[in-house]
């Protein structure tokens, strides 16, 4: 539902906890906006929290965003209900809502897991805004790692953030060298990594992800 042309742009999945810190909200909007301004399609799942910051950051700069849903595309089925207005804004501003499910299908747990993996499948890179060591975000993280696409985790400096349970996943991924640390000064470097990875992906292999 919406503008299919956004799929012509390289996708970047923006994911994370439903309970980001204050700086996590700011970071999600900032990085999504910066990538959107550089021509990327910001892909997320319309969830409360980090997903919302991804969509909002892209929309705020007039950029492209796609929401993968775990429910039907009709307004009555939108989940969560708190983001119904955001879903409508995405369509009005020429973004896109995508779903595997028929009209009238409500959200189920399996649908949420599948949605998380599909976000990574549609994208050429994944940005983790904030995540704990365990949680739903890891479905998309693992899908990104398995498909050998670039994974970025936002780096935080304040004690308030680095001591927060919802940031420990970011710290662990960078420490284990599974993700690049994403800083506000490193967006262009991140774009270079993404472009290089995109060029190395065989088109036939990429099609098999959908």
What are the language-model segments listed below?
Residues 1-210:
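Glycine-biased, small-residue-rich flexible motifs in mid-sequence functional cores and linkers
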